[in-house]
Design a protein with these regions (language model features):
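Membrane-embedded alpha-helical bundles of polytopic integral membrane proteins
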Residues: 1-209, 213-245
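Interfacial loop-to-transmembrane junctions
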Residues: 264-285
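A short, conserved beta-to-alpha structural element at the edge of catalytic cores
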Residues: 216, 282-286, 301
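Hydrophobic alpha-helical transmembrane segments of integral membrane proteins
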Residues: 105-106, 270, 287-288
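C-terminal transmembrane helix pair
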Residues: 261, 286-288, 292-293
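Juxtamembrane boundary at the C-terminal end of a transmembrane helix
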Residues: 295-301
Length: 301
């Protein structure tokens, strides 16, 4: 695959915008981060439902209560995953998300039975898979940002080790490493694959090559680990592990979404960003990487 400078320029500019938006959400406050991922969650769900309607025509017959109720239920998962320190009156924001979500779990199936044109368990399964694919990942990302200790100014935290005792900032840095690793992997995989890629990775995504995939992962891990070792002079093991998990799992996320698009017969999931398609095209890697990074963070950090 020959290197295409105009395509790369478009992809790079879109990636810069993406990273800038994500950094604003990370740097300002957990509230803004929740708002940002609420928008991402909504966009991913609408594109997911649109593609599922092409793959499974019966899904077009779900009621509006089902269509939007499941998105609200997924958003409640995100609220539940947020910090217990956020309160409305004397009630924690997390508890509000839990109880509204619990009510929806019981109400939505009854609404599906009463108002859908045809009750089809496949439709319920499709929505349940959407909750697992989209809502769970967004919830865990919010949990990493808001549910973990975070104090201090972000500019100081970028220059302190991950296991620092002088500032508890895991809630900022872990999401940052995920986003940076995926962005570097995506960019480097395209460059390496364009320059030296010859061996197709899979028929699901014909333009991807083994050379580009391996090169992207290795360069992503190298950049993040070297940053830890030489810029902030930190213990680099956590950085290496999180960047490797993000890059590898993110690649599988990219392939998964490519498979869904192929089944739906569409080139892009939407038209959010030039060179990157829709919400799912932009966040496919993140959706698969986050649960694995979250498990690592809970187990080892």
């Amino acid at each position: 695959m020959a290197f295409n400078w105009p395509v790369f320029k478009t992809r790079a500019l879109s990636s810069v915008v993406f990273v800038a938006v994500m950094l604003v959400g990370l740097m300002t406050s957990p509230w803004l981060f929740l708002l940002l991922f609420s928008v991402i969650h909504w966009g991913c769900w609408r594109e997911y439902q649109s593609m599922m309607e092409k793959i499974q025509p019966a899904y077009r017959d779900i009621s509006p209560f089902h269509r939007y109720g499941v998105i609200i239920a997924g958003w409640c998962m995100m609220v539940f995953a947020s910090s217990d320190h956020w309160k409305i009156g004397n009630v924690s924001f997390s508890a509000i998300g839990f109880w509204i979500g619990l009510i929806l779990i019981f109400v939505l199936p009854m609404i599906e039975i009463l108002f859908s044109r045809a009750m089809d368990l496949k439709n319920v399964r499709t929505s349940a898979l959407g909750l697992l694919y989209i809502s769970l990942s967004c919830s865990l990302m919010v949990n990493l940002r808001s549910g973990w200790p975070f104090i201090g100014d972000f500019s100081d935290e970028l220059l302190q080790p991950l296991n620092s005792t002088t500032a508890t900032y895991t809630g900022f840095l872990v999401p940052l490493i995920i986003i940076a690793s995926i962005w570097i992997n995506d960019t480097m995989a395209y460059i390496v694959g364009s320059l030296i890629g010859k061996t197709p990775l899979t028929a699901i995504s014909p333009k991807k090559t083994w050379e580009g995939t391996i090169g992207g992962i290795l360069l992503s891990v190298a950049v993040v680990t070297l940053y830890a070792a030489f810029v902030i002079k930190s213990s680099w093991q956590h950085y290496l592990a999180i960047s490797a998990i993000s890059a590898i799992a993110g690649t599988f996320g990219d392939l998964l979404e490519s498979k869904i698009k192929r089944m739906a017969g569409v080139k892009d999931s939407g038209s959010l960003m030039p060179g990157h398609g829709g919400f799912l095209d932009r966040f496919d890697s993140l959706l698969v990487a986050v649960p694995f990074v979250w498990l690592y963070a809970v187990a080892f950090m």
